[in-house]
């Protein structure tokens, strides 16, 4: 299971009501069955669909004040620079576009006050990796957006936190084992302890 699951699970254990967003309806059905309705609400859709974002955030806000937004979406694309095609670029850019749309809508419904926004990115936002040019470009874009938010809301009750984890041992690499072998993947950090560290610094 991934970092998003661990974050949701640990927040629920702490008594939070978590709204989870995913395009995978089957996975959301499993989570809805696992957790009670007063702990977890599932939203199924494309994080880059503006209408879906607006409708979902409005519904979430109707449940109460949004205290924390965690932007954790992202898909990898690991190739040599000349192998990238438009579809690869679009896939990587979904994470950046989704981050922006969910952040903007959340800030609006919160009146730009009393909210924490956690942007979970990657060490790929801090350097260039030979076979991750488009992925790194997306993550650098997320970093630039996050730093701009931090500048815009400095000294206010809007707190924007940047998180740059390295490799995590999850299914994130399931289609990339030609680049990151399963053996190497299993040397990466586990999502549970990472989620603990992130939440310790957020709540």
Give the label of every model feature segment.
Residues 54, 76-90, 131-134, 173:
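Conserved mid-core segment of classical short-chain dehydrogenase/reductases
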Residues 66-74, 95, 119, 161:
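Rossmann-fold scaffold of SDR-type NAD(P)-dependent oxidoreductases
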Residues 103, 138:
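Active-site helix of classical SDR
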Residues 110, 127, 148-158:
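Active-site-adjacent segment of SDR/Rossmann-fold oxidoreductases
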Residues 122:
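Residue(s) in the substrate-gating loop at a strand-loop-helix junction
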Residues 162-163, 181-203:
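C-terminal helical subdomain
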């Amino acid at each position: 299971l991934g970092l998003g699951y661990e974050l949701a699970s640990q927040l629920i254990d702490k008594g939070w009501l978590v709204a989870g967003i995913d395009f995978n309806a089957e996975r959301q059905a499993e989570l809805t069955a696992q957790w009670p309705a007063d702990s977890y609400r599932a939203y199924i859709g494309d994080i880059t669909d503006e209408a879906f974002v607006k409708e979902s955030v409005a519904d979430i806000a109707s449940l109460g004040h949004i205290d924390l937004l965690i932007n954790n979406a992202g898909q990898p694309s690991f190739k040599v620079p000349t192998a990238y095609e438009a579809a690869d670029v679009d896939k990587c850019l979904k994470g950046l576009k989704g981050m922006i749309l969910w952040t903007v809508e959340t800030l609006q419904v919160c009146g730009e006050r009393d909210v924490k926004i956690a942007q979970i990115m990657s060490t790929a936002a801090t350097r260039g990796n030979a076979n991750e040019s488009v992925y790194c470009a997306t993550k650098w874009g997320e970093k630039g957006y996050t730093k701009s938010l931090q500048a815009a809301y400095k000294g206010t009750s809007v707190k924007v936190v940047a998180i740059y984890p390295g490799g995590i041992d999850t299914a994130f690499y399931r289609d990339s084992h030609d680049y990151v072998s399963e053996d190497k993947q299993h040397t990466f950090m586990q999502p549970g302890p990472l989620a603990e560290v992130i939440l310790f610094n957020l709540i």
